């Protein structure tokens, strides 16, 4: 498949997953600082802090832990989704670490690449490479944020793993005929590739009767601290998810 065809498929599948995930191939803005654009080759600390401050302004009652958690989750959701869509729907992988993203008040939506280069390989090979690329990109986010706040690697690791598992659950909904063993093996591959503790796989459950994969997160997004919001269904704080 040509690079052009691969990215056409990637962008089309992205839009089917969610209209907020719109991609493009185009040059980076000449002045990234003026366009709310974050990229690993540019300083993005101010853009990320502006995102944090917009969340603080919108939800002052939620507190600093929520603003930080939400900021991190917003930075990471598109690269994770693109990795999964590329590997499982398009059988390839773009250079995730060079993915640019567009930051708006309280949200991150829209991504782009400079060119149509992509990698081909087996699922296992692509997952291994995706893990390296995501680790590099997320390390960059953490370094940029550490210029103005404290953000621990242990904190981001749990959010990273929950993000990966959340994508696996969505994948299982798109491909309900695949077995539970398949999804659990994929989870192990992703954890190894992303240098995440294998014990976190205990967050996943597969019900043979309903053929459904489910997740109880190890991290809490803290959205319940926002006025009018409740605990998420996969939250570890939810009463239904309390372990006896």
Curated annotation (Swiss-Prot):
InterPro entries xrefs: FCR-like, FhuF_C
Cofactor info, note text: Binds 1 [2Fe-2S] cluster.
Localization terms from the record: Cytoplasm
GO cellular component, one term: cytoplasm
EC code: 1.16.1.10
pH dependence: Optimum pH is 8.5 with Fe(3+)-nitrilotriacetic acid (NTA) as electron acceptor.
Effect of loss of the gene: No effect on growth under low iron condition. No effect on vulnibactin synthesis or secretion. Double deletion iutB/vuuB mutant secretes vulnibactin as wild-type, but has a significant growth impairment under low iron condition. Triple deletion iutB/vuuB/ics mutant supplemented with aerobactin has a significant growth impairment under low iron condition. Double deletion iutB/ics mutant does not grow under low iron condition, but addition of vulnibactin restores the growth.
Xref: Pfam families: FhuF_C
Reactions mediated catalytically: 2 a Fe(II)-siderophore + NAD(+) + H(+) = 2 a Fe(III)-siderophore + NADH; 2 a Fe(II)-siderophore + NADP(+) + H(+) = 2 a Fe(III)-siderophore + NADPH
Complexes and interactors: Monomer.
Temperature characteristics of this protein: Optimum temperature is 45 degrees Celsius with Fe(3+)-nitrilotriacetic acid (NTA) as electron acceptor.
The protein, known as: Ferric aerobactin reductase IutB
Function statement: Ferric-siderophore reductase involved in iron removal from the siderophores after their transport into the cell. Acts as a major ferric-aerobactin reductase catalyzing the reduction of Fe(3+)-aerobactin, a citrate-hydroxamate siderophore produced by other bacteria. Catalyzes reduction of Fe(3+)-vulnibactin, a catecholate siderophore synthesized by V.vulnificus, in the absence of VuuB. Catalyzes reduction of ferrioxamine B and Fe(3+)-vibriobactin in vitro. No activity with Fe(3+)-enterobactin.
Keyword annotations of the record: 2Fe-2S, Cytoplasm, Iron, Iron-sulfur, Metal-binding, NAD, NADP, Oxidoreductase
Molecular-function GO terms, alphabetical: 2 iron, 2 sulfur cluster binding; ferric-chelate reductase (NADH) activity; ferric-chelate reductase (NADPH) activity; metal ion binding
Induction: Expression is up-regulated by low iron concentration condition. Expression is repressed by Fur under iron-repleted condition.
Listed cofactors: [2Fe-2S] cluster
Binding site for [2Fe-2S] cluster: 220-221, 232, 235
Gene Ontology biological process terms, A to Z: cellular response to iron ion starvation
């Amino acid at each position: 498949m040509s690079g052009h065809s691969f990215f056409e498929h990637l962008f089309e599948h992205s839009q089917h997953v969610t209209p907020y995930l719109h991609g493009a191939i185009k040059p980076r803005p000449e002045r990234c600082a003026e366009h709310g654009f974050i990229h690993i080759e540019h300083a993005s600390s101010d853009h990320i802090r502006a995102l944090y401050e917009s969340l603080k302004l919108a939800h002052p009652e939620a507190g600093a832990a929520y603003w930080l958690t939400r900021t991190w989750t917003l930075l990471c959701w598109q690269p994770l989704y693109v990795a999964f869509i590329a590997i499982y729907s398009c059988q390839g992988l773009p250079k995730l670490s060079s993915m640019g993203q567009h930051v708006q008040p309280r949200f991150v939506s829209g991504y782009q690449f400079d060119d149509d280069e992509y990698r081909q390989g087996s699922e296992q090979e692509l997952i291994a490479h995706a893990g390296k690329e995501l680790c590099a990109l997320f390390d960059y986010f953490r370094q940029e944020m550490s210029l103005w706040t404290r953000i621990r690697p242990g904190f981001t690791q749990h959010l990273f793993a929950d993000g990966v598992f959340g994508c696996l659950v969505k994948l299982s909904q798109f491909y309900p005929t695949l077995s539970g063993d398949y999804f659990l093996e994929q989870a192990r591959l992703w954890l190894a590739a992303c240098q995440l503790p294998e014990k976190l796989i205990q967050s996943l459950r597969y019900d043979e009767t309903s053929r459904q994969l489910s997740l109880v997160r190890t991290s809490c997004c803290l959205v319940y601290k926002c006025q009018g919001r409740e605990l998420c269904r996969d939250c570890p704080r939810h009463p239904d998810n309390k372990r006896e």
